[in-house]
């Protein structure tokens, strides 16, 4: 009888949950819009720097930020490893009624974020020039890269704490505070960039200090939250890292971390290929590195929107899949894919019609600079109109419990297809090979995503019939 009552309560709970009954399109908009805003604000850190550095310092400044970007990617990997892993385990333990264990996991995650940030900052400062050489810096770019990275390294502990800690803040039922933390840092960076670069004449060092101050502000707000406003129970002793907690944190954060590390590897390999083959072309090494840095930031805006749509769809996919409402799962997937495809089409036409204007936002350069940048934007991003399918499908598989396939899907474009192609194609086509590797990798990732998605959606349709 007890089990029957419990089952009835679960059914009633499912029936009343908006995720299972509200119109799917409205639900996606409700969840996706805040996620898109959060992703765009986070992307603005790098984009704003790139714009003002391009306008105030020039092409070599843009190249320097591109060379330095793997440091940020690795820092993000650590933040997601500990932040997502900590937040996920916190929610699981709270759901199981283990409040003390949940708080201990949160404490271990927070202290580990701070420690990992300090360690990464020390490593970057100790091995600054060798790392920048590894990341693709040329002799002309190196002074700018040293100035920029040597300063931004001091902000790494606060950056990692803010990015990772915000996941724990959201898990503590404070999503608005989490969004404010991110936005405050981005706003401060946006205000200080032109002041420091142009007003004080500090050049690329000014951009670096603006970034650090913004990161410190976000990090301090996270610290203030857990000192003053937290809802969870968290004593000082819980901040001492425990190995047993760290293991479970890493287990759930590893997928996101691997994806970021893979991106860092692709960035490093790409920079070095551009440096080598650029030196053997009319463009030289610096122009390709600078241009690719600019265009990667442009692409970040597009990807932020698609990832935001994916994140907004995750609870809808997961809840309805668990409730066996497969028609709503398929409908939510179609809506998400359609939304991303519409956005992708808009970006595609902008890339093809207005390449000069887009590149010009990030500063001026020689005729060769614009020639390479415009060709790269039009060719490398030619398959943009299907590029929203892969991130949506990756999140889709993860949300319905197919985590391994989700990880594979997330790695298809950058690692499985793009990485070998940017190594092989230039052997036969020189620097142009890098450009053509992009659309081929995009097309292959798109086809693979569609094949697996159709297969899984077909299984759901069959299950409904049965």
Description of each model-found segment:
Residues 40, 44-62, 132-139, 195-201, ...:
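Helix-terminus/linker motif at the lipid-water interface of multi-pass membrane proteins
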Residues 1-32, 90-157, 199-254, 317-383, ...:
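Short alpha-helical transmembrane segments in multi-pass integral membrane proteins
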Residues 30-49, 151, 162, 185, ...:
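Transmembrane helical elements of multi-pass membrane transporters/channels
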Residues 19-51, 55-56, 70-85, 89, ...:
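N-terminal transmembrane alpha-helices
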Residues 62-122, 159-178, 271, 289-355, ...:
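Small-residue-rich hydrophobic transmembrane alpha-helices
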Residues 83, 152-170, 178-189, 207-220, ...:
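Short runs within selected transmembrane alpha-helices of multi-pass transporters and secretion channels
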Residues 35, 39, 51, 55, ...:
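Transmembrane alpha-helix boundary and packing residues in multipass membrane permease domains
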Residues 417-426:
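Transmembrane alpha-helical segments of integral membrane proteins
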């Amino acid at each position: 009888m007890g089990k029957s009552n419990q089952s009835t309560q679960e059914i009633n709970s499912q029936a009343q949950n908006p995720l299972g009954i509200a119109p799917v399109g409205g639900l996606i908009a409700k969840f996706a819009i805040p996620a898109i805003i959060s992703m765009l604000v986070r992307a603005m850190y790098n984009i704003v720097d790139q714009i003002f550095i391009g306008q105030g310092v020039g092409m070599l400044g843009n190249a320097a930020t591109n060379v330095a970007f793997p440091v940020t990617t690795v820092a993000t990997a650590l933040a997601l490893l500990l932040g997502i892993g900590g937040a996920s385990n916190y929610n699981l333990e709270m759901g199981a009624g283990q409040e003390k264990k949940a708080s201990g996991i949160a404490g271990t995650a927070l202290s580990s974020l701070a420690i990992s940030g300090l360690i990464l900052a020390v490593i970057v400062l100790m091995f600054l020039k060798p790392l920048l050489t590894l990341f693709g810096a040329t002799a002309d770019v190196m002074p700018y890269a040293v100035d920029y990275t040597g300063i931004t390294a001091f902000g790494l502990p606060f950056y990692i704490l803010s990015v990772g800690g915000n996941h724990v803040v959201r898990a503590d039922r404070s999503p608005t505070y989490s969004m404010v933390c991110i936005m405050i840092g981005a706003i401060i960076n946006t205000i200080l960039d032109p002041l420091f670069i142009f007003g004080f004449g500090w050049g690329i060092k000014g951009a670096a200090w603006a970034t650090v101050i913004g990161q410190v502000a976000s990090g301090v707000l996270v610290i203030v939250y857990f000192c003053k406003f937290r809802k969870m129970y968290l004593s000082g002793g819980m901040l001492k890292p425990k190995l047993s907690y760290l293991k479970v944190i890493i287990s759930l954060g590893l997928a996101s971390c691997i994806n970021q590390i893979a991106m860092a590897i692709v960035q490093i390999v790409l920079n070095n290929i551009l440096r080598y083959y650029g030196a053997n072309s009319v463009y030289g090494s610096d122009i390709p590195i600078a241009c690719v840095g600019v265009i990667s930031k442009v692409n970040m805006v597009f990807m932020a929107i698609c990832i935001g749509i994916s994140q907004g769809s995750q609870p809808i996919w997961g809840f309805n899949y668990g409730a066996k409402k497969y028609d709503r799962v398929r409908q939510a997937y179609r809506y998400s894919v359609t939304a991303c495809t519409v956005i992708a089409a808009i970006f595609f036409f902008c890339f093809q019609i207005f390449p000069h204007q887009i590149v010009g936002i990030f500063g001026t350069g020689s005729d060769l600079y614009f020639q390479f940048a415009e060709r790269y934007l039009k060719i490398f991003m030619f398959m943009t109109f299907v590029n929203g399918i892969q991130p949506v499908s990756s999140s889709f598989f993860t949300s319905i419990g197919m985590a391994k396939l989700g990880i594979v899907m997330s790695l298809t474009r950058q690692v499985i297809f793009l990485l070998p192609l940017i190594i092989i194609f230039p052997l036969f086509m020189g620097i142009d090979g890098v450009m053509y590797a992009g659309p081929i990798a995009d097309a292959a990732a798109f086809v693979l995503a569609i094949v697996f998605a159709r297969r899984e959606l077909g299984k759901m349709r069959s299950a409904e019939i049965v």
